[in-house]
Curated annotation (Swiss-Prot):
<keyword id="KW-0406">Ion transport</keyword>
<dbReference type="InterPro" id="IPR022929">
    <property type="entry name" value="Put_MntP"/>
</dbReference>
<keyword id="KW-0464">Manganese</keyword>
<feature type="transmembrane region" description="Helical">
    <location>
        <begin position="145"/>
        <end position="165"/>
    </location>
</feature>
<keyword id="KW-1133">Transmembrane helix</keyword>
<feature type="transmembrane region" description="Helical">
    <location>
        <begin position="120"/>
        <end position="140"/>
    </location>
</feature>
<feature type="transmembrane region" description="Helical">
    <location>
        <begin position="175"/>
        <end position="195"/>
    </location>
</feature>
<dbReference type="GO" id="GO:0005384">
    <property type="term" value="F:manganese ion transmembrane transporter activity"/>
</dbReference>
<dbReference type="Pfam" id="PF02659">
    <property type="entry name" value="Mntp"/>
</dbReference>
<feature type="transmembrane region" description="Helical">
    <location>
        <begin position="64"/>
        <end position="84"/>
    </location>
</feature>
<dbReference type="GO" id="GO:0005886">
    <property type="term" value="C:plasma membrane"/>
</dbReference>
<feature type="transmembrane region" description="Helical">
    <location>
        <begin position="39"/>
        <end position="59"/>
    </location>
</feature>
<feature type="transmembrane region" description="Helical">
    <location>
        <begin position="4"/>
        <end position="24"/>
    </location>
</feature>
<protein>
    <recommendedName>
        <fullName>Putative manganese efflux pump MntP</fullName>
    </recommendedName>
</protein>
<comment type="similarity">
    <text>Belongs to the MntP (TC 9.B.29) family.</text>
</comment>
<comment type="function">
    <text>Probably functions as a manganese efflux pump.</text>
</comment>
<dbReference type="InterPro" id="IPR003810">
    <property type="entry name" value="Mntp/YtaF"/>
</dbReference>
Length: 195
């Protein structure tokens, strides 16, 4: 029983690595605490639901959904990564603002393209799709499925939270260069998803 539990925890950690990396990249960019909470909750729920869905869908449907969902997630990451690179590069260049623009920027009221539930769901799916394929093997474990997927969800959510916290700390240390670093991380993740 202990060996099976250790196996499930290790599997959950591996499945949560994409969420950790993505959250760290977004943490470098700097996102609102409300967004972090929504993302962590979404990733946790998806890491519970996706294995259950995979268990019920079967291998053929899982392959079809896995390929397209991963590609869509990769496109979202390319867009966000490119946006972060552009913004980071622009921030290290000297800029002039009128009073209204400076006030908005200093107040942190610039709109983020990450704020919508649609983007949260797409990004959550992009890092949870591996859990769908893991669902096909859940029946072979000698552990109750509900406990297994709850462990996966809890660990993935925790790893997302750690990623945001780590990204925030690195962002404070590196300043505007964190935007560029975050963009590179997201582009690398997009390439990993496609390959």
């Amino acid at each position: 029983m202990i060996e099976i539990l250790i196996t499930i925890i290790l599997l959950a950690i591996v499945l949560g690595m994409d969420a950790l990396s993505l959250a760290m990249g977004m943490g470098l960019r700097g996102v609102a605490k409300d967004y972090e909470k929504k993302f962590v909750l979404t990733v946790g729920i998806l890491h519970v639901l996706m294995p259950l869905l995979g268990l019920n869908l079967g291998l053929v449907a899982g392959r079809f959904l896995g390929v397209w969902a991963t590609r869509l997630g990769a496109l979202v990451l390319v867009y966000l990564g490119w946006q972060m690179l552009s913004k980071g590069y622009a921030e290290i260049q000297p800029q002039r603002y009128n009073f209204a623009e400076a006030k908005t920027i200093l107040a942190g009221k610039q709109q983020s393209t990450l704020d919508s539930w649609t983007s949260i769901l797409l990004l959550g799916l992009s890092v949870s799709i591996d859990a769908l394929t893991v669902g096909f093997t859940l029946g072979t474990l000698k552990m109750p499925i509900l406990i297994t997927v709850l462990i996966m969800g809890l660990i993935a959510a925790s790893m997302s939270w750690v990623g945001f916290a780590g990204g925030r700390v690195l962002g404070r240390l590196t300043g505007s260069y964190a935007q560029i670093l975050g963009g590179v991380v997201l582009l690398a993740l997009a390439i990993k998803f496609v390959v």
